[in-house]
Amino acid sequence: MLHVGINGFGTIGKRVADAVRVQPDMTVAGVAKRSPNFEATIADDRGYDLYAADGREPFDEADLGTAGTVHDLIETSDVVVDTTPSGVGAANASLYAEHDTPAIFQGGEDADVADVSFNARANYEKAVGADTARVVSCNTTGLSRLLAPLRESYGVEKSRVTLVRRGADPGQTGRGPINDTLPDPVEIPSHHGPDVQTIFPDLDIDTMGMKVPTTQMHTHSVNVTLESEPATEEVTALLADESRLFLIPETLGIDGAGKLKEYTRDAGRPRGDVWENCIWAESITVEGRDLYLFQAIHQEADVVPENIDAVRALSERTASAEKSIRRTDEALGVGRGLVEHDGSPQRVDSHADD
């Protein structure tokens, strides 16, 4: 049983902890927090051992017991998943090295924070036995999952993606915009293209980014020039076969991210989370060698199964990407609980204790 420490219990950390808890080969060693805020209270209520990142006194004053400091958590963990805010993970890197504990960082860190940038579908094997890995950002994760099967089946000559990004997560009260549409950045490419190239170094990709006043999901407008000319139906079947790609049937009447999140909440997903890329099936179009589609990415959730797979890769628990992905998906419920593209319902009870 792998003992996994979670340093940080915010948007990503709490989801990773719950995902680790339901894995058959993992257990949560504990979670580290800087302050005894509501997230620390939730962690305690869920039965996770709390560790103090910046001293135990504030937790004692808040009557929240701690099992030790972050150093103690790292020492007791086989692998640590660092889900602290951007920049903090890089500052923590020396802690993990000091304790000789493999560590997984998030996509907000620069690529050089880790030995490898990681996406389970695209380059799992490169992280097997590594000391550190960086799970790429939510947008890069979504693009990598989409591009990997396209590259394998048809070859990719060039990718062009416009990313319409949510202004903030629901809990980020200090971010925006509130009433504007921003090119972000104005320069081309946005950082997303170079980040995808940390997964596919030889990929020709251009990306443009925008921010809009919503907290729902990111939406991508994708154009991929392939090296061959498959039929639209062939590409649709290829993508439908990927467990972490959900093709939204036209019959559901889901025309935006708001309805998509409403659907996943009603379907019983914990927190309404969408671990999969959500591709509008009717948007998939092939003209010559050019593929077009729209997809939505849930920025709070899509990297969660990737973190679980990264734990297995670093710990060398399995060298097989397919085996790890299947185990993660089965335990978490990825690829299930929603209506499949052929219209047949596939529902399972949620394993998460949310």
UniProtKB/Swiss-Prot annotation:
Pfam families according to UniProt: Gp_dh_C (PF02800)
Show the GO cellular component annotation of the record: cytoplasm
Which of this chain's residues are annotated to bind NAD(+)?
Answer: 11-12, 108, 166, 299
Its recorded reaction(s) are:
D-glyceraldehyde 3-phosphate + phosphate + NADP(+) = (2R)-3-phospho-glyceroyl phosphate + NADPH + H(+); D-glyceraldehyde 3-phosphate + phosphate + NAD(+) = (2R)-3-phospho-glyceroyl phosphate + NADH + H(+)
Cell compartments where the protein resides: Cytoplasm
User: For this protein, what is the EC number?
Assistant: 1.2.1.59
Q: In which pathway does it act?
A: Carbohydrate degradation; glycolysis; pyruvate from D-glyceraldehyde 3-phosphate: step 1/5
Q: Where is the active site?
A: 138
Q: Which UniProt keywords apply?
A: Cytoplasm, Glycolysis, NAD, NADP, Oxidoreductase
The GO terms this record gives for MF are: glyceraldehyde-3-phosphate dehydrogenase (NAD+) (phosphorylating) activity; glyceraldehyde-3-phosphate dehydrogenase (NADP+) (phosphorylating) activity; NAD binding; NADP binding
A biological process (GO) of this protein is: glycolytic process
Binding site residues for D-glyceraldehyde 3-phosphate: 137-139, 192-193
Keyword NADP found: yes
Give the first-level EC class, as a single word.
oxidoreductase
Q: Which family does it belong to?
A: Belongs to the glyceraldehyde-3-phosphate dehydrogenase family.
Its subunit composition reads: Homotetramer.
Write the protein's name: Glyceraldehyde-3-phosphate dehydrogenase
* Organism of origin: Haloarcula marismortui (strain ATCC 43049 / DSM 3752 / JCM 8966 / VKM B-1809) (Halobacterium marismortui)
Print the organism lineage. Archaea, Methanobacteriati, Methanobacteriota, Stenosarchaea group, Halobacteria
